[in-house]
């Protein structure tokens, strides 16, 4: 069923599996129109909210899980999700703190902070926190209607993102979309260490490409065929974008992720700066892992990125780091 959202991404998909047990995959945002659409979708199959016995969540973004708590409260349905998104599902304060820390590391001016915090507050209106859920692990098998749903952990867009595979069908959440690519959003470990999400996303896409699936049922948009081809195309897209980031950085000199985002996405407003910065940080992470970019902390704590020696040599700049930085001989 297709549920409306107030977000630029447009409608979100929820998938009803007749079971037994009757299973709903994702539940839409907490809005009156999405709730009415969910009820109408259930009625179309002769069902009421009380008939839903299991809710499986692909990831902890409000457009996908916002109504899960309300539906479970009515039906007593078991809610299942990956524990890595637990702070999102429970509205833990650390989620907002980590977003602000990511902006600081990226060198985003403090003037953007109020708009970002307001966006987070608006997002908070789109879901009721879960008080409890059953954690899902990679490889878990969920019996459903005489078959089995296989859980595949697909981090990158969100730390606890999962996909479900059964009988040639892939319920992919937001990791595999036909018309757009999922943003590699900034994530932190419980200990406060930033996770390099784009490398994880590419690993997830390559893993999905290898699955025995023929049809994708995505989080947004209609079903489509050939998940392997689409997953491979998305990996190639991110590799090309990383090359573009490398070229801009080599030409511009040392930059913060925010400064690079301003060059790559000029005119980005405060509400979208988090997405722009997260994407640039993701591609920088790929380049750092490949030895083509070096990162260091500036005096104010922001991370500064510069082209590594290998990248500069490849572009015809053969000065070593010491010569460029004025290092004296011992």
Q: What are these language model-derived features?
A:
Residues 58-64, 82, 155-157, 161, ...:
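Histidine-centered divalent metal-coordination motifs
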Residues 10, 33-36, 43-143:
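Active-site HxH/HxHxD metal-binding segment of metal-dependent hydrolases
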Residues 1-45, 49-51, 163-178:
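Conserved beta-strand hairpin/beta-sheet module of binuclear metal-dependent hydrolase folds
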Residues 23-25, 56, 79, 171, ...:
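Residue-level marker for buried hydrophobic side chains located in beta-strands
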Residues 29-31, 122-127, 131-133, 141-143, ...:
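Metallo-beta-lactamase
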Residues 96-100, 183-190, 264-267:
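Short glycine/proline- and charge-enriched loop/turn segments
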Residues 244-330:
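C-terminal regulatory/interaction regions
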Residues 73, 154, 288:
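Short, contiguous alpha-helical
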